[in-house]
């Protein structure tokens, strides 16, 4: 029965998120008015989520070349980096923000599933998962609901799928109350000769859909992700996909076995925009690679979960756990047999053509006929450069009180209880971090997560990071710091930083101040990546992260989340974060100008982050990274932990108590600290960049100092590790003294209390 379709006109195009200029361009491309199905195809492919139309011009300024890169940014489903021994790492980070705002459990779960599919469609087996999460204040009951749903969704999907969740970060700021951020990262390993391209090539080659049946879930999910959240967004729960980790596990194993047959010519995940994006993007890559390509697909052959689905619905469905395969002609039955073995559907639905078009048949009629390149990023999709106007942060400078008027000991303990500082144990204990048995240390015991690479002596380090408060206060410095802190964490673990992926979360790009934040923070990221020789392999842009919750429309803090990988040539060089041995000397690398601007302490004590971010010296950061890796290779570092959120006091406290099986204490005396009235606050709580606290054997001090001098990194001994308890002095004057027990109680219980006992700590 023929589906009755609405009349296609400018008004209907506007309902699909297309402006008048874009609708006119579609008519010019086709030479006619589009069909309803074609309008739907253009609307999702030209959405911000798929086309990057407001961001691609800026993204092209990032460094995208490096000796170890095997694919360029955006060329495939994920970045691919050579790590030697005929092995490569595939890795990528993506957002699932809007779905998680309206349906936190499924939104987060399908975010995890989708990013893993991007990895194994390249032939790589996922070996690790990380995440980066942002929520509003834990005082808000809905925020607690969102946190619970997101954490359970990540944990349930990852645990069931069998990939360890080894790291991540979580922050709480009021600006995320109505618009949480859920960024998921997957890392996989593949032998060079087993990689697969997301390309449609070989005229006459059969095209197969494998995996789950197609339903009505997720229709216009890409469009939903390309608009502002509002109170009406709750009505868009049908745009949120529903995931099945057990189905994806079967799909993974079947796909890797199918690739091993040698009969898979091309492979693409069906993520945003489903069949539409996979057919369009694979066709366009075929044209780019060979000069011709295209796919003709018959929707009558697509396994449908629901009866009576229209061509529009089938093409735009974002049902999960599906992929598109181009098989070598004559071997499609071999591919189908592999999937049947794993009880996974595999059906031939079309063929590769050479006419450079995506053609869609339904009930014997041609319902879409579109030039493939007109649909995709880098082809005919629109590209815009928006107005960018800098705006001073809407925050006040802090009126600091002299040290003498403050109970700094009480404030230090209170700082440990802050949700942004306190242990995230309640979160990561819901994740299986040890499945696959490659995870080297428990979560949080190293500054970067590290897994062993089987069959080699190597280790793979990985980290996600971004302090969005810094980016809000100073987009250029904040973008640089996001990359620098990731690299610093990688180096603290003993690994050399290799490359990054990014997930750029911002507000509405049509607002000049938001586009300025985006453009300027990307510039900062690029500066840092060039300084560290860590090219960008790809990633994701998520605009329109604004909401009407809280009495007015407001954008989130600009949040360019960085995902980074690094390599340990010898896993025995791994360095942990925590103190290891009583009697060790405590050393501080780095000696920047200390100020409280942007710090968690300043927000807690003075109610404002101030008006600027910490300073950042990229050359010093690179020197520090090289020094840390050198010291790890020389087996001179017993531990290393970077100074970041909460400042030096929090770093020392974490080093003392983070290994719950072996807690130690410290005695530290900070000398030559000047005479300013705020010097103790600045020494203990400044988040000045480029600093790391390490521990070494006392007799190694000379060798370490000499190596630091060779690397042009300031270093000084500030104390020693003791069996228990802690004391901190500034210029010989006792300021703080703690028991191990009270540090532990403050740090480990606070977040769970805040989330479940309605206490904002």
UniProtKB/Swiss-Prot annotation:
CDD domains: PurL_repeat1, PurL_repeat2. The active site is at 49, 96 (proton acceptor). The keyword Ligase applies. Substrate binds at residues 95-98, 117, 241, 318-320, 542. Signal peptide: none annotated. It holds the Pfam family FGAR-AT_linker. Keywords: ATP-binding, Cytoplasm, Ligase, Magnesium, Metal-binding, Nucleotide-binding, Purine biosynthesis. Its main location: cytoplasm. GO terms for biological process: 'de novo' IMP biosynthetic process. It catalyses: N(2)-formyl-N(1)-(5-phospho-beta-D-ribosyl)glycinamide + L-glutamine + ATP + H2O = 2-formamido-N(1)-(5-O-phospho-beta-D-ribosyl)acetamidine + L-glutamate + ADP + phosphate + H(+). Its EC number is 6.3.5.3. One of its GO terms (cellular component) is cytoplasm. This is Phosphoribosylformylglycinamidine synthase subunit PurL. It comes from Chlorobium luteolum (strain DSM 273 / BCRC 81028 / 2530).
């Amino acid at each position: 029965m023929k589906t009755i379709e609405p009349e296609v006109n400018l008004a209907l195009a506007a309902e699909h998120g297309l402006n008048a200029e874009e609708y006119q361009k579609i008519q010019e491309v086709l030479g006619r008015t589009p069909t309803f199905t074609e309008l739907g195809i253009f609307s999702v492919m030209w959405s911000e989520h798929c086309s990057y139309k407001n961001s691609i011009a800026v993204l092209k300024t990032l460094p995208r070349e490096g000796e170890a890169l095997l694919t360029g940014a955006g060329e495939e489903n994920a970045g691919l980096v050579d790590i030697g021994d005929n092995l490569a790492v595939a890795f990528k980070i993506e957002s699932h923000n809007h779905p998680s705002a309206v349906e936190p459990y499924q939104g987060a779960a399908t975010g995890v599933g989708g990013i893993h599919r991007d990895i194994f469609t390249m032939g790589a087996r996922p070996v690790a998962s990380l995440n980066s999460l942002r929520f509003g204040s834990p005082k808000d009951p809905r925020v607690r609901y969102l946190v619970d749903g997101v954490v359970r969704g990540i944990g349930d999907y990852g645990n069931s799928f069998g990939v360890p969740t080894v790291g991540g970060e979580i922050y709480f700021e009021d600006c995320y109350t109505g618009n949480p951020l859920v960024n998921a990262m997957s890392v996989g390993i593949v032998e060079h000769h087993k990689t697969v391209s997301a390309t449609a090539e070989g005229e006459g080659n059969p095209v197969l859909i494998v995996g789950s049946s197609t339903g009505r879930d997720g229709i216009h999910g890409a469009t939903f992700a390309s608009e502002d959240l509002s109170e009406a967004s709750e009505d868009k729960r049908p745009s949120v996909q529903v995931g099945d980790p057990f189905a994806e596990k079967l799909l993974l194993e079947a796909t890797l076995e199918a690739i091993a047959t040698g009969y898979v010519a091309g492979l693409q995940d069906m993520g945003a925009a489903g069949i539409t994006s996979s057919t369009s993007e694979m066709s366009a890559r075929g044209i780019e690679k060979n000069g011709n390509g295209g796919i003709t697909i018959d929707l009558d052959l697509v396994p449908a979960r629901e009866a009576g689905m229209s061509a529009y619905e089938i093409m735009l469905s974002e049902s999960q756990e599906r992929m598109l395969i181009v098989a070598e002609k004559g071997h499609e039955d071999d591919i189908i047999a592999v999937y049947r073995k794993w009880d996974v559907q595999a059906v031939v639905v079309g063929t590769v053509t050479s006419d450079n078009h995506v053609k869609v048949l339904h009930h014997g009629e041609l319902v879409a006929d579109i030039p493939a390149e007109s649909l995709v990023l880098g082809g005919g999709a629109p590209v815009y450069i928006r107005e960018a106007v800098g705006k001073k942060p809407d925050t006040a400078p802090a009126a600091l009180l002299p040290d003498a008027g403050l109970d700094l000991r009480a404030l230090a303990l209170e700082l440990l209880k802050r949700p942004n500082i306190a242990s995230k144990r309640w979160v990561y204990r819901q994740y299986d971090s040890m499945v696959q048995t490659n995870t080297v240390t428990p979560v949080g015991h190293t500054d970067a997560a590290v897994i062993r690479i089987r069959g080699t002596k190597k280790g793979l380090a990985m980290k996600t990071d971004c302090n969005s408060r810094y980016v809000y206060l100073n987009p250029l410095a904040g973008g640089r710091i996001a990359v620098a802190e990731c690299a610093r964490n990688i180096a603290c673990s003993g690994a050399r930083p290799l490359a990054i992926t990014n997930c750029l979360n911002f507000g509405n790009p049509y607002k000049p101040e938001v586009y300025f934040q985006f453009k300027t923070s990307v510039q900062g990221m690029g500066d840092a990546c060039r300084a560290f020789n860590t090219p960008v392999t790809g990633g994701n842009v998520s605009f329109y992260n604004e909401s009407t919750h809280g009495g007015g429309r407001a954008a989130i803090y600009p949040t360019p989340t960085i995902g980074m990988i690094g390599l340990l040539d010898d896993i025995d060089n791994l360095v942990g974060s925590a103190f290891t041995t009583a009697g060790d000397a405590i050393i501080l690398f780095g000696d920047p100008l200390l100020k409280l601007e942007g710090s968690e302490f300043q927000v807690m004590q003075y109610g404002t982050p101030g008006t600027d971010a910490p300073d950042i010296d990229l050359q010093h950061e690179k020197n520090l990274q090289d020094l840390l890796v050198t010291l790890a290779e020389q087996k001179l570092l017993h531990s290393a932990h970077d100074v970041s959120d909460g400042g030096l006091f929090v770093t020392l406290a974490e080093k003392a108590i983070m290994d719950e099986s072996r807690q130690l204490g410290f005695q530290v005396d900070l000398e030559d600290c000047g005479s300013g009235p705020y010097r103790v606050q600045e020494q203990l709580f400044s988040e000045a960049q480029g600093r790391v606290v390490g521990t070494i054997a006392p007799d190694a001090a000379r060798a370490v100092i000499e190596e630091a001098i060779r690397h042009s990194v300031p270093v000084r001994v500030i104390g020693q590790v003791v069996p228990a308890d802690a004391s901190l002095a500034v210029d010989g004057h006792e300021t703080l003294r703690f028991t191990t027990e009270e540090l532990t109680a403050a740090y480990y219980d606070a977040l769970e209390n805040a989330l479940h006992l309605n206490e904002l700590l």
